Curated annotation (Swiss-Prot):
It is a single-pass type II membrane protein. InterPro entries: 6-blade_b-propeller_TolB-like (IPR011042), Strictosidine_synth_cons-reg (IPR018119). Residues 1-32 are annotated as: Disordered. The modification N-acetylserine is found at S2. Residues 2-40 are cytoplasmic. Disulfide bonds: none annotated. The modification Phosphothreonine is found at T19. The gene is APMAP. The chain crosses the membrane at residues 41-61. GO terms for molecular function: arylesterase activity. This is Adipocyte plasma membrane-associated protein. Exhibits strong arylesterase activity with beta-naphthyl acetate and phenyl acetate. May play a role in adipocyte differentiation. It comes from the Eukaryota. PANTHER family: ADIPOCYTE PLASMA MEMBRANE-ASSOCIATED PROTEIN, STRICTOSIDINE SYNTHASE-RELATED.
Amino acid sequence: MSEADGLRQRRPLRPQVVTDDDGQAPEAKDGSSFSGRVFRVTFLMLAVSLTVPLLGAMMLLESPIDPQPLSFKEPPLLLGVLHPNTKLRQAERLFENQLVGPESIAHIGDVMFTGTADGRVVKLENGEIETIARFGSGPCKTRDDEPVCGRPLGIRAGPNGTLFVADAYKGLFEVNPWKREVKLLLSSETPIEGKNMSFVNDLTVTQDGRKIYFTDSSSKWQRRDYLLLVMEGTDDGRLLEYDTVTREVKVLLDQLRFPNGVQLSPAEDFVLVAETTMARIRRVYVSGLMKGGADLFVENMPGFPDNIRPSSSGGYWVGMSTIRPNPGFSMLDFLSERPWIKRMIFKLFSQETVMKFVPRYSLVLELSDSGAFRRSLHDPDGLVATYISEVHEHDGHLYLGSFRSPFLCRLSLQAV
C-alpha cells in the first residue's frame, strides 16, 4: 500500500463526549436548584410574616369610621370656563412661615384679620402680625391640642367695627379688635335641639348684625378629624340661625354631609351652604315668599367646596383644595361607593398619612348669581397656592385663605 493509500484510509479523530454521572456539571445543577429552593422558601416565609400580621390587623383592628356608600354623577369635564390653567401661580405669598392655617379672612378698612391654627385671631397690618384674641389656652402645638386651644375658622366684619368669629371648638364670638374685648355669643357646649355642636365652622352675618347664620359641620366629629368626617360621609351637619338680640337658635336645615362655608345673598333672602362631602352648594331661603324652603344652587361641582364669599360682579367665589378631575381619576369618587376600602385604609393609616396622597390641586371658582360657572383659576400642582379654604375679595385683589398652609396668598384681579 502506498503512502497515499494509507492517507486515504485514515479518518479524522472525532471528539469524544464523556458522560459521567459523577461529573461536576450535575453537581452544579443540583447546587443551583438548591439555591433556588432556598430563595423561594425565604421569600415565602417573608411574605407570610408580613401578610399574616397585616391580615390580623385588618381583622382585629376597629376602623374609626363607619362609612356609608355614596353615589356621585360623573364629574363635569374640565373644558370651557373650567379648562385648567395656572393663573393662581401669579399670586404672591404673604406672611410665609409666620402663621399657619389662615382659614378665613376679613377686612375692616384696609386692616386684615384672620384666625390661625394655634387658636389666635390676629391683625395683619403693615407687614406685622398682632394677636387680638384667643378663645382657648395653650400650649397649642399639635392638632390634638385644638380642643383646648380653640381653632378660629369663619370670620366676618360686623356693622359696628367688630368681628364675628366661629371657633370650631368654642362657639360664636364677637371681638372688638381695637379694645381687645371678647364676647361669647353662643357656646359650643350648648345643645341645639338635643344635639351637641362638635364642629362650628363658618358664619355669615346680616347687614344690621342681628342674625348670624352658621354651620355646625358635625355633632360627632371635631375639626381635627375633618378627613374622617369626609370619608365617613356622616349626615349629621346642620345650618343654624342665631339671633344676637333674643339669643335664640334655630335649625334651618339638617342631615347635611359636612356643611361648610356659608354666604347670605345680597338681598338677604337666602343663605348658600357648601355641602363639601357631596360636592355641591345648597340654598336655604330665610325670608320672603319661599322662606323655609331649600333647593340645590349648584350640584356636581368639579371639586369639593369650602368657604363661599361674595364677588364684586354680584356672584360668589368658592375655594376648593382638591378637585374631581375629568378627564382623570378621582380617588374620592372611586372610594365613595366602596366603603370597605375606606374602612381598611383608616385601620392601617393615620389622617396625616392619608392626606399625603390627596392631590394638591388648588381651584377657585367664580359663580354667577344663579350658580353658573363664570370662570376658574387653577394651580394644578399646588406650587404657589395650596389647600385653599376661602377666596376673599378686597380692593381689586383676591386673598386666598388656607386651612393648613403656613401663609396666605394675594392675587391681583387685573392679572387674571
